[in-house]
A protein has these predicted regions:
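Long protein-protein interaction modules used by eukaryotic assembly/scaffold proteins
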Residues: 2-17, 21-22, 66-105
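N-terminal ordered "arm"
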Residues: 2-58
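An N-terminal, globular interaction/scaffold subdomain
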Residues: 36-86
Length: 105
């Protein structure tokens, strides 16, 4: 059986955030964490921010239960922008209902 996944973030084809099939219990803390991290990175990197943002690798993650919602979450995150160029990562994530944390390859 295929595992359900959802998406949150920016896509060049859209004018605003994409939020698809992810619970607010994940999206709300994940969004806050990303915004705080991006603000800190912009401050620390100054003029180098944009180059660093767009050359960042795709990140794979496993989140323990309670970090961003009750369920453990597995996913990937990459740099992206919306239609007018506003920067914000795109995240694809899936809750692990059985409590497992699969190895990402």
């Amino acid at each position: 059986m295929a595992q359900k996944f959802g998406a949150f973030g920016k896509l060049p084809a859209l004018g605003d955030f994409l939020k698809m099939d992810l619970p607010a219990s994940f999206v709300d803390p994940w969004d806050r964490w990303l915004q705080e991290g991006m603000l800190a990175a912009r401050s620390a990197l100054g003029d180098r921010w944009q180059d660093c943002y767009f050359s960042a690798p795709i990140w794979r993650f496993n989140l323990s239960p309670g970090l961003a919602g009750a369920a453990p979450m597995t996913g990937v995150m990459m740099s992206s922008v919306d239609r007018v160029g506003r920067q914000f990562p795109l995240t694809l994530a899936s809750p692990q209902a059985d409590g497992s944390a699969p190895v990402l390859q």
